[in-house]
Amino acid sequence: MAGDKKFVEDITPMDEDFAQWYTDIVKKAELADYSSIRGCMIIRPNGYGIWENIQKYVDTKLKEYGHENVSMPIFIPENLLQKEKDHVEGFAPEVAWVTHGGDDELAERLCVRPTSETLFCEHYAKIVQSYKDLPKLYNQWCSVVRWEKTTRPFLRTTEFLWQEGHTIHETKEEAESHSLKILNMYSRLCEDMLAMPVVMGKKTDKEKFAGADDTYTIESLMHDGKALQAGTSHYLGQNFSKAFAIQFSDRNGKLDYPHYTTWAVTTRLIGAIIMVHGDNSGLKLPPRIAPTQAVIIPVAQHKEGVLEKAKELKEKLAKVVRVKLDDSDKMPGWKYSEYEMKGIPLRIEIGPKDIEKNQAVLVRRDNREKTIVSLDEIEIKVQEMLDIIHNSMLEEAKKTRDEKTYVATNMEEFEDTIENKPGFIKAMWCGDRACEDKIREVTGATSRCMPFEQEVVSDTCVCCGKKAKNLVYWGRAY
């Protein structure tokens, strides 16, 4: 049992050092490993399996909405990147450049894509002539590169995986509606699959995507009270269409520019799962996103009939859930600690006495509750238990978020709250960027979003005291 204890002792308590706790879980749960390239990571099977399940959900939804997957080049010529001024200025500090092919210097530098708007625009300009060609609903799954100064696995890496959607539409109304439709899908992904509550809203002009008219966001709150942007959807207006001369003949035969949307979620969602649900024993995976939803642990497996029954149970459960049987010769206690660390939502124990009674023991990862169930109805009981676990994890995360959401009506309250009670701060704002800049300068907090569900917590701006225009969620963020 000393080994079992050591297994968990290797995790730094989150209250002692949250950043180290996070890193310990990434490594101990075998989600990712560091590579020899600064800021790049090796996503291991446990981590990639989570991403695959995110992919399945998002890809299925996008295809239901009529999107098609494509693949764009990884390189962008410098002249192409320069076409949209605000866009290139927003990404210039993070761009990685290719200057040589073999020993030969290239005639023009190639950017390793930080995002692909320019490539999609170049393509759309070639294939769109008429309103009958619209809308174009494209998506791609790929990796992108942004030369970050400070990196952390999943949360901020030089290279990361994502999906990026790029659509063009006949009208502003259609494009804006589509942008919000995608944001709603991202919200459902977080709540229905990741058991992670989010606040939906619109970014301020200061925080919106480079080159966008409007940026919509879903914001989540981590255990340590920091915010994390979990997904964004942007309405780019006609800015990119005009920059890249994408034109179509409208219903009256006149030339017009299509309205553009772009949106993405990334592997940083895996980091969010860790920081919303994890505890000092390791990872806690929401059942619907977990690569392995249940693990069967035979107890006293050397005794006659135990392994055979465990294998029979696995075969039965594999038809309804993602299940693993651990029939290794490690002690059951070691296995319990290992799978608790790795966040497997449900442990199923079966031993000689259980077989005699035609039962198995279900142990929940989220709260360690044990339930005895009959083997005759174990398929339905396991599925029911996984749904119960998901709902319980979502409610617990909502409770934590709500407990760490505060109201401030002046800067004194704001500063005191951000220093002593980390979390979301709801405060009114006049709409002046100078106030937004001052809040960041003084407190380190940024505007996370202007929530769609507006409320009035004060009549005046938290910073300057002038008449307020919007409620804003503020917070320090990843």
From Swiss-Prot:
<dbReference type="GO" id="GO:0016740">
    <property type="term" value="F:transferase activity"/>
</dbReference>
<keyword id="KW-0648">Protein biosynthesis</keyword>
<dbReference type="GO" id="GO:0017101">
    <property type="term" value="C:aminoacyl-tRNA synthetase multienzyme complex"/>
</dbReference>
<dbReference type="InterPro" id="IPR016061">
    <property type="entry name" value="Pro-tRNA_ligase_II_C"/>
</dbReference>
<dbReference type="InterPro" id="IPR002316">
    <property type="entry name" value="Pro-tRNA-ligase_IIa"/>
</dbReference>
<comment type="similarity">
    <text>Belongs to the class-II aminoacyl-tRNA synthetase family. ProS type 3 subfamily.</text>
</comment>
<dbReference type="InterPro" id="IPR033721">
    <property type="entry name" value="ProRS_core_arch_euk"/>
</dbReference>
<dbReference type="GO" id="GO:0004827">
    <property type="term" value="F:proline-tRNA ligase activity"/>
</dbReference>
<dbReference type="InterPro" id="IPR004499">
    <property type="entry name" value="Pro-tRNA-ligase_IIa_arc-type"/>
</dbReference>
<dbReference type="InterPro" id="IPR002314">
    <property type="entry name" value="aa-tRNA-synt_IIb"/>
</dbReference>
<dbReference type="InterPro" id="IPR045864">
    <property type="entry name" value="aa-tRNA-synth_II/BPL/LPL"/>
</dbReference>
<dbReference type="InterPro" id="IPR006195">
    <property type="entry name" value="aa-tRNA-synth_II"/>
</dbReference>
<dbReference type="InterPro" id="IPR036621">
    <property type="entry name" value="Anticodon-bd_dom_sf"/>
</dbReference>
<dbReference type="GO" id="GO:0005524">
    <property type="term" value="F:ATP binding"/>
</dbReference>
<keyword id="KW-0030">Aminoacyl-tRNA synthetase</keyword>
<keyword id="KW-0963">Cytoplasm</keyword>
<dbReference type="InterPro" id="IPR017449">
    <property type="entry name" value="Pro-tRNA_synth_II"/>
</dbReference>
<keyword id="KW-0436">Ligase</keyword>
<dbReference type="GO" id="GO:0005737">
    <property type="term" value="C:cytoplasm"/>
</dbReference>
<dbReference type="Pfam" id="PF09180">
    <property type="entry name" value="ProRS-C_1"/>
</dbReference>
<dbReference type="GO" id="GO:0140096">
    <property type="term" value="F:catalytic activity, acting on a protein"/>
</dbReference>
<dbReference type="GO" id="GO:0006433">
    <property type="term" value="P:prolyl-tRNA aminoacylation"/>
</dbReference>
<keyword id="KW-0067">ATP-binding</keyword>
<comment type="subunit">
    <text>Homodimer.</text>
</comment>
<dbReference type="Pfam" id="PF03129">
    <property type="entry name" value="HGTP_anticodon"/>
</dbReference>
<comment type="function">
    <text>Catalyzes the attachment of proline to tRNA(Pro) in a two-step reaction: proline is first activated by ATP to form Pro-AMP and then transferred to the acceptor end of tRNA(Pro).</text>
</comment>
<keyword id="KW-0547">Nucleotide-binding</keyword>
<dbReference type="InterPro" id="IPR004154">
    <property type="entry name" value="Anticodon-bd"/>
</dbReference>
<protein>
    <recommendedName>
        <fullName>Proline--tRNA ligase</fullName>
        <ecNumber>6.1.1.15</ecNumber>
    </recommendedName>
</protein>
<dbReference type="Pfam" id="PF00587">
    <property type="entry name" value="tRNA-synt_2b"/>
</dbReference>
